[in-house]
């Protein structure tokens, strides 16, 4: 599995489109309808966006700078093992911590509520709940995970309450298949785990294979593809921009046709777009063929709206072996 945890800056600033007088009038008249942005979903809805100045700069070459030394958690459900990995200067992963864990009584591959399986996918820690706020069966506390994630929801996977937690002393040597879907370990190792990861925002990979030891061979190809996508976006060439989206695209509310119409409509009223992408995290999605999960920080500004936040895209190879977007949304 490819793993990239790096700070890669892709900056596209002010590709201006000349608008005819009538289009300029439409832009002004439409500002009340198309001038603001719903930051939670990335959709323009109102009239309180801030205007920014029209500046033009050249597009710099993409550069990979400092690799972010942010630990990730990997749960190998086939072996009942959890590891925490750090990153060396050359991008190689090294194990910082390892422990045996128990998973769902019915194994892995959760698809529905109550199936007592542990999900497979890429998740984030949301918070840590202390022992005093939990029943005894959770031991010294629990990290909550964001299952179901965006991809799970697209696949109609149900259920919730998937945690990484401790266990009471009388169950210190619990069997491999023992939980209702959570990942659990003895309290001593849970306390050690807390020393390495953050309560919120730590990446947790749950899979049957994969050990993240290197950046992998696809780094250059996928980063170049992302840069080409951002180039098409800021150019305001709608046809070129949509060519980066697969016909199977779905973001939970819009399919490919809906997205095509939506983006074409809102971008028609823009005179320029500025984009800066940075702090990439790139992973092959567990147990999926040719599906890459890309998370990054996005700073976006246009002639009628500004937004900054973290975004997720899922890229899949089409029948011509080109990486195309099948999902886009906010993290």
Task: Show which residues each predicted segment covers.
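Surface-exposed, charged secondary-structure patches
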Residues: 117, 264-312
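Short, solvent-exposed secondary-structure junction/capping segments
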Residues: 238, 242-254
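N-terminal post-signal-peptidase region of extra-cytosolic proteins
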Residues: 55-71, 101-114, 123-128
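Short beta-strand edge/turn micro-motifs at domain boundaries
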Residues: 307-331
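N-terminal secretory signal peptides that target proteins for export/translocation
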Residues: 1-18
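Exported/periplasmic cell-wall-interacting domains
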Residues: 115-120, 129-227
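Bacterial N-terminal signal peptides
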Residues: 23-35
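Short, aromatic-enriched amphipathic alpha-helices that serve as compact interaction elements
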Residues: 218-237, 244
């Amino acid at each position: 599995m490819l793993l990239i945890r790096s700070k890669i800056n892709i900056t596209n600033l002010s590709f201006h489109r000349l608008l005819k007088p009538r289009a300029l009038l439409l832009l002004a008249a439409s500002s009340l309808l198309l001038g603001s942005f719903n930051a939670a979903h990335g959709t323009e809805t109102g009239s309180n966006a801030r205007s920014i100045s029209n500046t033009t700069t050249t597009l710099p070459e993409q550069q990979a700078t400092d690799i972010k030394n942010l630990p990730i958690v990997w749960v190998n459900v086939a072996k009942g093992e959890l590891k925490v990995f750090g990153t060396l200067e050359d991008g190689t992963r090294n194990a910082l911590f390892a422990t045996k864990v128990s998973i769902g009584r019915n194994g892995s591959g959760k698809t529905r509520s109550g199936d007592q399986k542990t999900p497979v996918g890429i998740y984030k820690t949301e918070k840590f709940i202390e022992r005093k706020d939990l029943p005894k069966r959770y031991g010294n506390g629990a990290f909550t995970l964001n299952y179901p994630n965006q991809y799970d929801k697209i696949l109609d996977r149900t259920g919730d309450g998937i945690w990484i937690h401790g266990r009471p002393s009388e169950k210190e040597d619990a069997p491999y298949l023992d939980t209702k879907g959570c990942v659990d370990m003895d309290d001593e190792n849970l306390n050690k785990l807390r020393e390495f990861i953050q309560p919120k925002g730590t990446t947790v990979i749950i899979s049957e294979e994969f050990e993240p030891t290197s950046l992998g061979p696809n780094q250059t190809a996928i980063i170049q593809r992302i840069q080409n996508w951002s180039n098409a976006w800021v150019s305001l060439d709608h046809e070129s921009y949509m060519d980066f989206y697969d016909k199977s695209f779905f973001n939970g509310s819009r399919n490919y046709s809906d997205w095509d119409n939506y983006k074409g409509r809102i971008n028609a009223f823009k005179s320029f777009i500025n984009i800066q992408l940075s702090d990439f995290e790139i992973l092959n999605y567990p147990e999926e063929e040719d599906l890459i999960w890309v998370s990054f920080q996005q700073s976006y500004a246009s002639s009628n709206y500004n937004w900054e936040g973290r975004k997720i895209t899922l890229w899949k190879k089409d029948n011509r072996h080109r990486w195309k977007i099948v999902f886009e949304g906010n993290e």
